[in-house]
């Protein structure tokens, strides 16, 4: 039977376009994994959406004198366009500003309250004397007490990833007017993490989690080592999910964004089921079986700054609610730097996805971001390296192999030729192809995407060497049967590589699928649909029908006689002048 696989992807704040660090950190790895699992024949549900209640949205709205809804309507469509252009195959990319999400968040809050995992407590809140109001944590900046980073946010430091409260900062100030922040008492609801800690530890210790990435495991262990304490889940805010209690104290408070955002994975699954016409289908990924086992393997693709929210806080919420599936794996990526320096949106030192997706092939961007991906350590986008790797690996290795084999076959046979007797060189390539297929499969199962892509490219190099050694362009003139055998073996390898590369390079893999004489779709793409927001305005979502790729993860069974079509290059060679042009463009926009 096929497995149920939940691919849950980090919810981006709808306050600005994506840069390549966002794509490399969560969305592209999730898509590669989801496409692979669908090809395996498993039942995949890949969900995410725009986080509409994040403080950065409120900050942007206040600075421009517009509403948070206006900010969301500006940037949410840009996310969908980037995902479409790059082929990020969500079953549903929605947003937290929906009636469904508000209902689900309310249900979870009330269940936790009923089960005794929420409590009220008076805390100290950040207050602006100049504005006469409480400030959300992200409206506060100061020096990090842990590492000394001068622009640490009120809830977390971008310099070291440390989580803290605003009063922990040195010289805290308001991001709205730069005025010093004071602190006043205010009452809020807290999630009782200390009460949930024994169950959380039991879950984490129930299996060997060495398959988690080292940094994910280390972050989680460090949090537990320090001991868990209650964490506020409401804030003095005007924008967000209302606190569902009959208490005038909480009339002007809202559920805190970190609590409602992680619930989005669950609420998006419910929305997907409702839209699919099978309103209870979400349960097949979420509701535990009678014996307590999970109905699915749940993978959460995030950046490293969100690890504790997904390995501690979200599992604690699920445990407190009861009978919902806990994460199986949390493949958290490190950060992608740019030309050796950390990306900074405030300085505009970033490579914006809407810009580069217009200038370069989607598969070229996808290839570089995985081949150079920040899986276990920070990595770096370098324009010189991008051009070199696209030209030497995508164009000269994989693209050249596919083009040579298909061109020779189409020109001399018009179809997959009937092979003759095999020699040792043929058998060696056949064995190498089978071995690579098994190795890539194992690596993808372990979410080792970078190594899997390297393994596939190594097979392309081996196949190129086989062609160079066998010289079928000469054999077609002197030994047709031998030429037919060489091209048959090479075609089988190219066809297998098409499948291995498909999760990484869906656009070129689909074109190659058609050149090899297949009908149908091996790499379906997402599309945009329109629905309504709670205020009645049009709301866009991203969805797709990916059933056509199910069960196609097999080594080649290309049969003699199958038509082979005239090829065109799969990838565009990049001119070396691109490096200087892009660096000039980058430096022209940077702010001091």
Curated annotation (Swiss-Prot):
UniProt keyword Protein biosynthesis, yes or no: yes
Chain ranges for the short sequence motif 'KMSKS' region as given in the UniProt record: 342-346
Cofactors: Zn(2+)
Annotated catalysed reactions: tRNA(Met) + L-methionine + ATP = L-methionyl-tRNA(Met) + AMP + diphosphate
Enzyme class label: ligase
EC number: 6.1.1.10
GO biological processes: methionyl-tRNA aminoacylation
Motif stretch ('HIGH' region): 12-22
Segments traversing the membrane: none
Keywords per UniProt: Aminoacyl-tRNA synthetase, ATP-binding, Cytoplasm, Ligase, Metal-binding, Nucleotide-binding, Protein biosynthesis, Zinc
Cofactor note: Binds 1 zinc ion per subunit.
Gene3D superfamilies from the UniProt entry: HUPs (3.40.50.620), Isoleucyl-tRNA Synthetase, Domain 1 (1.10.730.10), Methionyl-tRNA synthetase, Zn-domain (2.20.28.20)
Binding-site positions, ATP: 345
InterPro entries referenced in this protein's UniProt entry, alphabetically: aa-tRNA-synth_I_CS (IPR001412), Anticodon_Met (IPR041872), Met-tRNA_ligase_1 (IPR023458), Met-tRNA_synth (IPR014758), Methionyl/Leucyl_tRNA_Synth (IPR015413), MetRS_core (IPR033911), MetRS_Zn (IPR029038), Rossmann-like_a/b/a_fold (IPR014729)
GO molecular function: ATP binding; metal ion binding; methionine-tRNA ligase activity
Cellular component GO terms held in the UniProt record: cytosol
Annotated Zn(2+) binding sites: 144, 147, 157, 160
Subcellular location: Cytoplasm
Family named by the database record: Belongs to the class-I aminoacyl-tRNA synthetase family. MetG type 1 subfamily.
Function: Is required not only for elongation of protein synthesis but also for the initiation of all mRNA translation through initiator tRNA(fMet) aminoacylation.
Oligomeric form and interacting partners: Monomer.
Descriptive protein name: Methionine--tRNA ligase
Organism: Roseiflexus sp. (strain RS-1)
């Amino acid at each position: 039977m096929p497995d149920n696989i939940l691919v849950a992807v980090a919810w981006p704040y709808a306050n600005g376009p994506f840069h390549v660090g966002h794509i490399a950190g969560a969305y592209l790895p999730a898509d590669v994994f989801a496409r692979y699992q669908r090809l395996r024949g498993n039942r995949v549900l890949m969900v995410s959406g725009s986080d509409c209640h994040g403080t950065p949205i409120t900050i942007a709205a206040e600075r421009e004198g517009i509403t948070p809804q206006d900010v969301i309507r500006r940037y949410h469509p840009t996310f969908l366009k980037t995902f479409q252009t790059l082929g990020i195959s969500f079953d549903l990319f929605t947003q937290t500003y929906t009636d469904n999400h508000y209902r689900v968040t309310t249900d979870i809050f009330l269940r936790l309250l009923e089960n005794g995992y929420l409590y009220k407590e008076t805390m100290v809140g950040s207050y602006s004397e100049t504005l006469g109001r409480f400030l959300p944590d992200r409206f506060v900046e100061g020096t990090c007490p842990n590492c000394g980073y001068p622009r640490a946010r009120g809830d977390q430091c971008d310099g070291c990833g440390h989580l803290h409260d605003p009063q922990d900062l040195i010289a805290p100030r308001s991001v709205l007017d730069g005025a010093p922040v004071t602190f006043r008492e205010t009452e809020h609801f807290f999630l009782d993490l200390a009460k949930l800690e024994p169950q959380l530890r039991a879950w984490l210790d129930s299996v060997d989690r060495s398959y988690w990435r080292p940094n994910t495991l280390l972050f989680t262990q460090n949090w537990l080592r320090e001991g868990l304490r209650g964490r506020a889940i409401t804030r003095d805010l005007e924008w967000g999910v209302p606190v569902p209690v009959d208490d005038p104290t909480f009339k002007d408070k809202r559920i805190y964004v970190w609590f409602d955002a992680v619930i989005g994975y669950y609420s998006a699954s419910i929305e997907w089921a409702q839209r699919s016409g099978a309103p209870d289908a979400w349960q097949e990924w979420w509701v535990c079986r009678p014996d307590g086992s999970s109905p699915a393997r749940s993978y959460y693709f995030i950046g490293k700054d969100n690890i504790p929210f997904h390995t501690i806080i979200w599992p604690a919420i699920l445990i407190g609610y009861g009978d919902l599936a806990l994460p199986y794996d949390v493949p958290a990526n490190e950060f992608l730097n740019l030309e050796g320096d950390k990306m900074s949106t405030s300085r505009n030192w970033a490579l914006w996805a809407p810009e580069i997706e217009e200038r370069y092939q989607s598969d070229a961007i996808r290839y570089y971001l995985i081949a150079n991906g920040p899986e276990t350590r920070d990595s770096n986008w370098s324009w010189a390296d991008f051009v070199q790797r696209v030209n030497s690996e995508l164009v000269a290795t994989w693209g050249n192999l596919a083009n040579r084999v298909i061109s020779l076959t189409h020109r001399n046979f018009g179809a997959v030729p009937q092979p003759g007797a095999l020699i040792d060189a043929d058998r060696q390539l056949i064995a190498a192809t089978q071995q690579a297929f098994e190795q890539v499969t194992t690596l993808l199962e372990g979410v080792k995407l970078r190594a899997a892509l390297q393994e596939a490219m190594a097979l392309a190099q081996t196949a190129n060497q086989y062609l160079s050694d066998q010289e079928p362009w000469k054999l077609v003139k002197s030994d047709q049967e031998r030429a037919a055998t060489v091209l048959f073996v090479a075609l089988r390898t190219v066809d297998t590589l098409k499948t291995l590369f498909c999760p990484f390079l869906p656009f070129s893999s689909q074109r190659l699928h058609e050149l090899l004489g297949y009908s149908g779709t091996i790499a379906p793409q997402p599309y945009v649909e329109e629905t309504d927001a709670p205020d009645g305005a049009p709301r866009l979502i991203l969805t797709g029908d990916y059933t056509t790729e199910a069960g196609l993860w097999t080594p080649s069974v290309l049969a003699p006689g199958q038509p082979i079509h005239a090829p065109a290059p799969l990838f565009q060679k990049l001119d070396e002048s691109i490096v200087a042009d892009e660096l000039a463009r980058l430096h022209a926009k940077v702010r001091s």
